[in-house]
Amino acid sequence: MRFDDSDIAAVYRAIFERRDMRHFTPAPVDPAVLARLLRAAHHAPSVGFMQPWRFIRITDPALRTAIHALVEAERCATADALGERQDEFMRLKVEGVRECGELLVVALADGRERHVFGRRTLPEMDLASAACAIQNMWLAARAEGLGMGWVSLFDVDALRALLRMPDGAKPIAVLCVGHVDAFYAKPMLEQERWAARMPIEACLFENGWDDPASTDADGSHPSPAEATAEADADAATNIDADAASTSTTSIDGSPERIA
């Protein structure tokens, strides 16, 4: 049965207004809301119904501090690997581990090798399934008015050891969840000119892999600056982000203009 138009619009609104948040207020998250978010995550699709996700809620301040130290170490290592973009990267805020109301670590469960259905030729489908759970939680958080950020800057083995995970388990995400003063009008990395959203035409092929129409002759995509300029021209016709957050979003594709 088709959803009502208002329900459909709400789904698309959550998708297009979801943001990878890095700025949080210290306000606590209502335990009932957190429970709803985790339940939404647990109802994600998974290949072979393997349900590979495991969530560790971090409530120990010392553990939170230790996790932040791991993230900071990897942030510096990533900067060193970025060459000429090192300084630009270091100016970005890439996590909210210390500020967010709730901190969760998502891991792939141990014993995943026994799940053969759907993984015999694509063993990475356990990761894809867990990513679906994270996306479910992300959209639910946005609908609840909470921000969420996925942090992947950490040494996998170090975080596994810190949280006493069994052999075979693998941490894949540090999730910062909490209240925010405002949601970004556009993805933060787009706002900061780090990158820009590719046109859908560059990602959509028909009956085989084609060179996207927007791809240059040398095989490269437009530079972040060029793509961002185009996105800014589009954004000039958008409604104000604050007004968008309180208005009814249509279901004819226009919600994409908010993103």
Located regions from the model:
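Extreme N-terminal tail/first-helix region
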Residues: 1-14, 90
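Short hydrophobic/aromatic-enriched beta-strand-loop microsegments
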Residues: 78, 169-175
